[in-house]
Amino acid sequence: MGVSDYQLGMAYGEFVSSYVDEDTEKILILQKRDIDDMNESQIYTQISNSVQKAAGNNDIQIRGRNLLSTGTFETEEAVTDIFQQKRNIPDILVCMDEETTECARQAVLDFNLAGKVKIIGYYTSEDILAVEKGVISVTCDVDTTQLGQYSVEALTNYIKDGRTNSYYNVDINFLDRAAVEKMRREADTDEKASVE
């Protein structure tokens, strides 16, 4: 149960490609995966394939970096190091987990690169505020309601049949500034309706 790497890579690839323009030269994908070679990652492969299609003849450098062996402090240091190397600052930074997204958000603010580096993040807690302010271009959100429903369904099948034989792909949504503003309006409307 969850989001498959292929599904996640395809979805991220679509969004990364939508941010590629004639000025895009470098894309960096940050993952925390138990993979020796980033080229073996389905996520990296799908993003790379989508970007190459969108780029056409433009030569875009796509790199992946594995931050698996790092803790919170080390992740923060690794992300900061990316921005300290002025020649290697990516035009698009893809973050595949909440911690890396938060570190990237902070680094973009610290180095005064908000709006210059497009961050495609993961998770929606305080990141929604950064999306609203334009610091993070878009963030990925797993449909937790659907995840819960599938969990109950799988457990029910297991209790009834003694097994479950399906892999449940959970939907993912990408939230940009317009989507976040819509969510806020709906939440405000729901809140006002419950008070009345």
Roles of regions detected by a PLM:
Residues M1-L28, E74-E76, T124-I128, V142-K160:
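Hydrophobic alpha-helical segments within soluble ligand-binding/sensing domains
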Residues V51, L67-L129:
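Hydrophobic alpha-helical
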Residues L8-Y12, M38-Q61, E74, A78, ...:
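Short, solvent-exposed amphipathic alpha-helices that sit
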Residues K26-I29, V51-F73, D171:
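Short beta-strand elements in bilobed, periplasmic/extracellular small-molecule ligand-binding domains
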Residues D21-I27, A55-R63, N88-I92, L113-K118, ...:
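Loop/turn elements at helix/coil->beta-strand transitions in domains of secreted/extracellular proteins
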Residues E25-M38:
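Short beta-strand segments enriched in small/hydrophobic residues
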Residues D143-E196:
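Hinge/cleft segment of the Venus flytrap/periplasmic-binding protein
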